[in-house]
């Protein structure tokens, strides 16, 4: 059994995966996706830092860095070719693409009947101002691609909307506006692996951003049946084998599914709940591929 990890060498998540694999008697080398070299003819068809990857049984994807359009497309194509050659890529290229795209995820969640905030995406300044008004004059503006709460701003007045939208226009950005959902400065992260919720935490923050990377503090949460159902359905919508599903407990007692993270972090979950997500993920994948070591 040959396993590799695409991620940050020495990073916490990478090392936790390597530790979980070692407990099963497997070693895994770690490479950055920026080290990928693909060959249309000859072998290896795909390598990283000269090491072949197309003879791997499993490749765990822990990071796809930001880059130019060409770089991102090439990296995702490389993952697809690995899958085409029979390598188990976790998560799949398609799931990663779906999860990173906030518009696509929101649209799929809505179409699947899951509760998710009203969202409007557009390219023109005038349409963005109209969307701000349509969504009630209290919105969260997000980058279409992003994570950890970076680049997200809340806008509650027209003057600020005008200035922010003009700045985004200069940067030739897409406008992604989502209605603000009152949530008591807390949200829920449910972690899904292999069709089950292995753990959940409530994240409390000083402000409206509830990402652990933005300083929110996690505490263990026993998910109810409704929360489990929403989390599993959300992960299925994007085709994720494992996912961190972010859900807002609304002030009216209902839930809103915000995002489905398909390269999810689990460090805060481990600290809050003691759940070893890396071990759960490794055990699930090895069972799926028939490894009994």
Across the structure, where does each feature detected by a protein language model lie?
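Extreme N-terminal starter segment of soluble prokaryotic enzymes
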Residues: 1-4
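Conserved N-proximal alpha/beta basic substrate-recognition cap immediately N-terminal to
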Residues: 8-118
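Short, hinge-like loop/turn segments at secondary-structure boundaries
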Residues: 22, 46-49, 107-109, 135-136, ...
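Structural detector of well-ordered beta-strand residues that form the stable sheet scaffold
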Residues: 89-90, 117, 140, 176-178, ...
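ATP-grasp fold ATP-binding core
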Residues: 106-110, 132-150, 172-183
